[in-house]
Every structure is written in structure tokens, then in C-alpha cells.
Amino acid sequence: MDFKKLDPELWQAIANEEQRQQNNIELIASENIVSKNVLDAQGSVLTNKYAEGYPGRRYYGGCQFIDVVENLAIDRAKQLFGAKYVNVQPHSGSQANAAAYMSLVEPGDTIMGMDLAAGGHLTHGSPVNFSGKTYNFVSYGVDKKTEMLDYDEIARLAREHQPKLIVAGASAYSRIIDFSKFREIADEVGAKLMVDMAHIAGLVAVGLHPNPVPYADITTTTTHKTLRGPRGGMILTNDENLAKKINSNVFPGTQGGPLEHVIAGKAAAFGEALTPEFKEYGEQIIRNTQEMALCFADNEKARLVSNGSDNHLLLLDVRNFGLNGKEAEKLLDQVNITVNKNSIPFETLSPFKTSGIRIGTPAITSRGFNEEDSYQVAKLILTVLANKDDEQVLADVKRQVKELTDAHPIYAEYSIR
């Protein structure tokens, strides 16, 4: 059947998004470009099948091949992260975190998590999120001078508040996280440790960031971002009793039927992550980020939070350009460079404006951008921020963006049919 003829309105919307992805330089740190294999797996007939339960223990018949798919995803994840137990069913990272909390603490218990403005995530205790509404969260931040995690201050807060659980991990933190120090702090106050490695999972998988699994009671992650899989979540542990709690808190605790077509996409992505090529990909992410950081460091107006990066992302304070994050995001979008406004440590503006933008390299690296390309992209960003009212300059930047995206297509052979 011809999709375009049957539903031209929907077809056009998807085709337009495909073109946007092709023509834009995607720098949102939580986004990536999945492989054709992941697309094929996620668009397969597995979407037709209900499969409540777990492999070998389903509430529906006809799941023998579904079990093969889910076990592939589980086994590959175990191999990637050195975990004894893995649940690949969470529909998202937020749902993975919800099930993890339910497995570790009770409503009203005290939990420590990273402050959202300092780089944490909504599910790490934001008052507008279920986490902040269900549990008593105490936030920790970063050092005012270095803008890096201050483990002595985190330990002091832990001694003061005696949390039942400490959450490590971030959504906008550009430095290495020392999970062994978090484990020491948790042990000192008798707390459990949960790590949300959503942003860095792909780097962890290939040894480019310390692995939290040996230190954490429970580790959660998304399966997209640096892991370059479909949008979804996952939970890992080495504790058999916690694994049982996790399974029951995912199903039936927070979800019904798993999305087996998405789990197939996860299995495909995990298979790719086990290859030598994926380690090369991770190394290129780091090199591209470092190259962008060098370019920003040479500009007197550009200020990088924590003065650089150890991973896949950068936080750029744009106030010296006479802009806020919202304005910078909109301005860059005009030349087909996509970033997101982002709060910075000790933020003074609202989350709807912010003082900074977040820049990530996973998606452009998937497209084949190298260090030279990444340096050029950083220069283009600086040119735009410094010339917000010069239409001629902005038009020239847009032309250079087109040259870069034409040279690095998102899918050489794929287009919506």
C-alpha cells in the first residue's frame, strides 16, 4: 500500500521531519541518529504482539519468538555493562527511575539528588515531577568556583540529612562522575546508591566513562542518547533480591504490556554497541566535543561551564553575547543549528529563558562529522551569537550548514516510503 496516497497529511509531516533532520545540525545532547537496523527492528511486526510478563513467564500465548528477542536484548545489555540482572521493559528513563525508587525506598523517605539547575534531571527530585512529590528530596549541586561536583559537600549534606537513597547522574553535567566516591558517601550514612547513567551509557559501554554498575545498588538508563538505540529505558543491578523487586515494580507495578518492537530496537542497538566500531564512535564523540571546547575557549565572550568537558556535551553560558538561552536557541534554529536552552549552575533566570545552551556531539558524530567539522560548527555558533542582527552573516552561516549536512547525510539510502 502507498502510505503517501493513503494518508498524505501524516506522510507529509513525517517527510518534513526527515528533511529537517537531514538539513539541520543536531546538537541536542540527548538526541542521536539510530541505524537502519534499529529503524527496521522498531518498525517490525513485533508491534502487533502483546506480551505481558517476562520471558518464559508470559500472560499471553504465542510469545516464543518475542522471548527470543527480549532475551537477546537482556543478554547483550549484561555483556555491555557487566550486570547480572537487566530489565529492558521500561518505556522510558523516567519510568525506569520510578520503578527503581519503588524498589529502594518508600513514599516520604529522604533521597538526595542533583539539583536540576546544576545539571540534574526532573526525576531527581524536581518539585513539579512525581519524584519530588512522592519523596522528600534534598538537592546537592556543584562547587561555585569549579562548577564541578563537590564530594565533600555532598558528604556533609548526607551526614546532615541521613537519606535512605542517594541518586548520582545528570542530564547536563560535562565532567566525569566518580561513582566510587558516591558509594563511600552512601555507605557512610547507610544509604542505598542509585545511578542514572542515561546520558553517558554509550560511553560507559565502551570504557570511556567509569562504569557505575559495580558501585550502584541499581543503575538506570535510557537506551537512546549516546547508546544510539530507540527511545526507551532499562534497569540494571547485581543484586538478585533487588532484581526481583525491579521486575515486579516494572510489571505490574508501573506498566502493562512491554513494547516488544522497541525492545527489538534495543537489542539491535546493543548488538551494535558490542562491536569495535562503536568504541571508535565513542572515541570520536569525545574528540569532537574537545575540538568544539577548544574553539569556544579561544573566544573571549564564550564561557563554558566548568571550563570544558570530559564527555559528550558542553554547557555554554551565552550572557556575554547579550542573549539568554531561549534567544540563542531561536537564533541558531534560524540557521538550521539545533540546540536547547539550558540552565547553568547558580542560574538567575527562569527555566523558560535560562543563561545557557546545551551542546552535544552524539548525533553529528553518527553522521560522520570529524574534529575539523566540529570545530567549524563551533565557529558557526559563535558567529551567529555575535551577529544576531546581521542577515547577510546569518545567510552565509546557513549556507555553510547546508554544505556540512549535504556532505554527511543522515541515511544514505533511507527515506520514508
Swiss-Prot record:
Disulfide bonds: none annotated. It catalyses: (6R)-5,10-methylene-5,6,7,8-tetrahydrofolate + glycine + H2O = (6S)-5,6,7,8-tetrahydrofolate + L-serine. The record marks 224 as: Plays an important role in substrate specificity. Coiled coil: none annotated. Homodimer. Catalyzes the reversible interconversion of serine and glycine with tetrahydrofolate (THF) serving as the one-carbon carrier. This reaction serves as the major source of one-carbon groups required for the biosynthesis of purines, thymidylate, methionine, and other important biomolecules. Also exhibits THF-independent aldolase activity toward beta-hydroxyamino acids, producing glycine and aldehydes, via a retro-aldol mechanism. This is Serine hydroxymethyltransferase.
